[in-house]
């Protein structure tokens, strides 16, 4: 029994030392972690220092921050797999001249047999529901337009123009001819607009409603009008005078419900189409073949 008492008395000092060491460690840990008032943090700054708190960036663990940081990453993983990107914008669909006279009406001005990519000027129209879709194209780096007129003269006309600006865009604008001057009108009936500038040509496509509320600058397309065709240069996105002094126009009023494919030779191809010129050529040919008496 005496031996057991001696062994217990030997363990008591050791247990007391371990207990005191544990208490000391618990008292020191708040100061070391910077949790207590006036303590020092892991970066050696005073926890009570507001300026130091602002200097150290903090991480926001909210979902919005997580999503933003996730999508800011360039790759999904270290293997380098890129994030899927938005699909490219559909390219401008080419104008189908084979539909001219069948499912849409067309006007071609230029070389005989030309199409939407080679004519000096091209226009098509077709009904789509309560709208009329127009396609315009011209050999210019500025603008191409169509005017709806009660006569063949410029003045008091509703005009839709596709304008190529300095940023490379093609915008659809609405004008009203005041005499020989085209005034831009803020109310624009065009929608579903698209345009492109390629191969030194301005080409566009847009829709506008057949019937519109009464407005002197916007005509009702269910009525028949003369169509005025024009194109020319632009300066900083603003149209200037058309390329030719006497722009072509439709020979008669146009109905959007009647699809025709009409060709108009440009000035360079009109010389030999004149009846007088043809008669002169026949006379000269006969003279050369028969010889002088």
Curated annotation (Swiss-Prot):
UniProt KW Transmembrane helix keyword: yes
One example of a Gene Ontology biological process annotation: regulation of synaptic transmission, glutamatergic
Parts forming coiled coils: none
UniProt biased composition (Basic and acidic residues): 46-61
Pfam families in alphabetical order: DOMON (PF03351)
Subcellular location, record wording: Cell membrane; Synapse
Residues annotated as signal peptide: 1-28
GO molecular function, one term: dynein intermediate chain binding
GO cellular component: endoplasmic reticulum membrane; plasma membrane; postsynapse
TM region positions: 271-291
Stretches the record annotates as Disordered: 30-61
Keywords, in A-Z order: Cell membrane, Membrane, Signal, Synapse, Transmembrane, Transmembrane helix
Subunit structure: Component of the outer core of AMPAR complex. AMPAR complex consists of an inner core made of 4 pore-forming GluA/GRIA proteins (GRIA1, GRIA2, GRIA3 and GRIA4) and 4 major auxiliary subunits arranged in a twofold symmetry. One of the two pairs of distinct binding sites is occupied either by CNIH2, CNIH3 or CACNG2, CACNG3. The other harbors CACNG2, CACNG3, CACNG4, CACNG8 or GSG1L. This inner core of AMPAR complex is complemented by outer core constituents binding directly to the GluA/GRIA proteins at sites distinct from the interaction sites of the inner core constituents.
Task performed by this protein: Important modulator of glutamate signaling pathway.
Name by which UniProt lists this protein: DOMON domain-containing protein FRRS1L
